[in-house]
């Protein structure tokens, strides 16, 4: 009993001292001995088409914009992997794919337990440290929401997925892709209570409105804007004007290695069935983003009105970005800017004198685990990769040399620096882009001999020296790289090219 009391007291003192050291003081509205709560908002497939990142001139995201203006807005943040499963596994386990071997999409319930036993899921770590942990909807990739569920969460509830939301629409004939029926852009007339993301937001708001007996870790996942783009009519109707297309170069792929093109699965989800399909898909994406912003607002408004407002750290991230025509792609699954760049915001009410800033240094989402640990005074496990980015909460202009590392399949890596991107694929082919002069990554400089020393230095200094073998599973894996299934993606890419040629849809941009 005495030992437990002493341990709890020590934890509180550590949290208090950590807050003072890192952030320079605690808000006078919060009790100094309160361990901070955490509200983690996880959005699916959200790219930079948000107001605070300026990705599209017609986007409407007032709630997320307000949060970005209130906290620290990391404008050069990047996912660890441009796919739902590997990105979330890396963030929630705190380990890079090249060290875990979790490269493709998994159902973690069917992975050999020995491959995962050395990792501690982030919610479980918080629960072991006295937090009440609550998970709502898509926090892990959907098949993994039951992974160690009873261990991780005091309370967990999964709401509707995109597949279920298809039942909301009566006209199921608009499948604009010739070979795939997943991408749909369509409003639904159903009441809000029929939408899973709305219900997740309402559940979170109810939780936040109640007094809690101990600090909480509340993770709220929103599935939109993941395909299918099905949202209430009110959100669709805000985007009835002609939709501006993003900057696109017709021959953009001419200097891209074949492995880069096939690895990105460029032709898998291109909507070309109708003449206006591209615009309709972009309209659907913007409307889906707008609906998600409303749901984020519901949660943030509830927190603001709650007794927890002055003692809750808010963190918002997306698992990766999304292409909407750039480089002929309407998906993620690439090592290019549209797929790797992600919204990322941290608001800590104890950081009041330094909040309201933007940070343009390269930040990887692999750093979320250590950062939340440091902000709450919890010790991170020794194996955890990344670093705490609390120094950039104190000084958003602090230079950062280390690039963000993005992995898409074993042997395929991207390094995102402040002004450069360097990609290297498993076969040795490369890409290099100067973002200061070429923000859309249209000119691959990798074959220019003037940049050979720079490429050599980047590769030697920052690319992984060792790669864990791909973890096996009791089920067939999705999105396995050609390094582990030779030529599969290349051959798939070639088949799609033939199909598009046969229907005279190739090339879709030139």
Predicted regions and their residues:
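N-terminal secretory signal peptides that target proteins for export/translocation
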Residues: 1-8
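Formylglycine-dependent sulfatase
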Residues: 7, 16-18, 28-425, 429-430, ...
């Amino acid at each position: 009993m005495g030992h437990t009391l002493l341990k709890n007291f020590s934890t509180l003192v550590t949290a208090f001292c950590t807050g003072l050291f890192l952030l320079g003081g605690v808000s006078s509205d919060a009790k100094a001995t309160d361990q901070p709560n955490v509200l983690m908002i996880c959005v699916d497939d959200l790219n930079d088409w948000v107001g605070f990142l300026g990705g599209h001139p017609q986007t409407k995201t007032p709630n997320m914009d307000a949060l970005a203006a209130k906290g620290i807005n990391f404008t050069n943040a990047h996912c660890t992997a441009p796919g739902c499963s590997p990105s979330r596994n890396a963030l929630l386990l705190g380990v890079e794919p090249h060290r875990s071997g979790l490269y493709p999409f998994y159902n973690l319930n069917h992975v050999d337990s020995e491959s995962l036993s050395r990792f501690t899921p982030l919610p479980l770590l918080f629960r072991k440290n006295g937090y009440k942990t609550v998970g709502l909807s898509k926090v892990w990739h959907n098949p993994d929401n039951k992974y160690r569920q009873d261990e991780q969460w005091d309370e967990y509830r999964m709401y509707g997925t995109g597949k279920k939301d298809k039942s909301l629409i009566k006209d199921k004939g608009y499948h604009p892709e010739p070979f795939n029926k997943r991408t749909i852009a369509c409003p639904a007339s159903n009441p809000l209570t029929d939408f899973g993301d709305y219900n997740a937001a309402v559940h979170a708001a109810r939780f936040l409105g109640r007094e809690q007996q101990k600090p909480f870790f509340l993770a709220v996942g929103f599935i939109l804007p993941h395909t299918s783009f099905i949202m209430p009519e009110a959100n669709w109707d805000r985007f009835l004007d002609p939709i501006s297309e993003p900057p696109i170069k017709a021959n953009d792929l001419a200097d891209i290695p074949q492995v880069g093109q096939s690895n990105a699965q460029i032709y898998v989800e291109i909507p070309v069935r109708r003449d206006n399909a591209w615009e309709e898909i972009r309209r659907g994406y913007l409307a889906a983003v707008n609906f998600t912003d409303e749901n984020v607002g519901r949660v943030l408004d509830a927190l603001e009105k709650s007794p927890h407002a002055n003692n809750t750290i808010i963190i918002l991230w997306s698992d990766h970005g999304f292409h909407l025509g750039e480089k002929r792609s309407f998906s993620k699954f690439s090592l290019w800017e549209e797929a790797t760049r992600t919204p990322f915001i941290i608001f800590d009410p104890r950081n009041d004198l330094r909040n309201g800033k933007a940070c343009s240094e390269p930040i990887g989402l692999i750093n979320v685990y250590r950062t939340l640990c440091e902000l709450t005074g919890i010790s991170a496990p020794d194996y955890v990769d990344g670093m705490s980015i609390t120094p950039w909460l104190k000084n958003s202009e602090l230079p950062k040399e280390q690039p963000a590392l993005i992995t898409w399949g074993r042997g395929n890596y991207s390094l995102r620096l402040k002004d450069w991107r360097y990609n290297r694929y498993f076969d040795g082919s490369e890409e290099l882009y100067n973002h200061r002069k070429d923000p859309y990554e249209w000119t691959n400089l990798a074959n220019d001999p003037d940049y050979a020393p720079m490429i050599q230095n980047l590769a030697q200094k920052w690319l992984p020296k060792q790669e864990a073998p791909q973890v096996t599973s009791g089920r067939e894996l999705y999105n396995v790289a050609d390094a582990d299934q030779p030529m599969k993606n290349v051959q798939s890419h070639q088949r799609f090219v033939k199909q598009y040629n046969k229907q005279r849809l190739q090339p879709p941009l030139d």
